[in-house]
From Swiss-Prot:
UniProt lineage: Bacteria, Bacillati, Actinomycetota, Actinomycetes, Bifidobacteriales
Gene Ontology MF term list: structural constituent of ribosome
Name this polypeptide is given: Large ribosomal subunit protein bL34
Keyword Ubl conjugation: no
InterPro entries: Ribosomal_bL34 (IPR000271), Ribosomal_bL34_CS (IPR020939)
Gene Ontology CC, one term: ribosome
Native organism: Bifidobacterium longum (strain NCC 2705)
Length: 44
């Protein structure tokens, strides 16, 4: 059986990237929550 995680940076950024987060209201909320929490990385 093959592993489920096959790393791919392009797919990672397309699905979980900063620009994708900024597109929707809830995505922006995610970024703001992570900023408030003091996360070093806000998104993929």
């Amino acid at each position: 059986m093959k592993r489920t995680f096959q790393p791919n940076n392009r797919r990672r950024h397309m699905k979980h990237g900063f620009r994708l987060r900024m597109r929707t209201r809830s995505g922006r909320a995610v970024i703001n929550r992570r900023r408030a929490k003091g996360r070093k990385t806000l998104s993929a």
